[in-house]
Amino acid sequence: FTAWQRGTAFRAGANNDDSCTASRWVLLSDGNDIVDVVRSAGDVDSSFYSIGLDVETVDKKFGIVQIIENINTGALGGKGNTPVSLSFKAKVSGGGKLDNVKAAVIAWSGTADSVTSDVVSAWNAEGTAPTLATNWTYENTAANLSVTTSFADYKIENISVDTSSTNNVAVFIWSDVTDTDAGDFLYITDVQLEPGATANDFKRETHTTTLSQ
């Protein structure tokens, strides 16, 4: 989360559901003004920044998604043949209620790059994964990652992207909690999706390289 070209905070209108925020990440939420998005400190040993999701409207699910362009999906290997692995760092703070964070790789089988960026059709009850919009499919079964108040590495490995006619792939990370307090925070950084059955250390790029992409 080194590139914040659109600003370093997204609040009051700029934080609505399906709003583009930092580094091409799209904010998703069960309604508008559910969380503010702010540039926050990353992990002390590596990450300069993280994305901070600050609860404004309580008892609603929220998350972020990044959609990979069709031309770049080839870097993930042969669709249906090469597994992919997702890794990232996360932590929470606040009243201790953000205790169910999940992540998934999802696939788009509609027209290449003509994606529905609001990938959630229905957020559903706590503990039940959101229903995805038409043409989006979960490629792994999302489980509670038990995120704590300290940054830690989370890995979901050996994911088979086997949806027929996959044209785009996305990473979706969300809070699956419907009992939150105002001021609860979810911090996420160092998100990496790569080909292979295991996740490797995060590959750091210069700020200039990130901005050029």
Segments from the language model and where they lie:
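Extracellular and organelle-lumenal recognition/adhesion modules and their flexible linkers in secreted
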Residues: 2-213
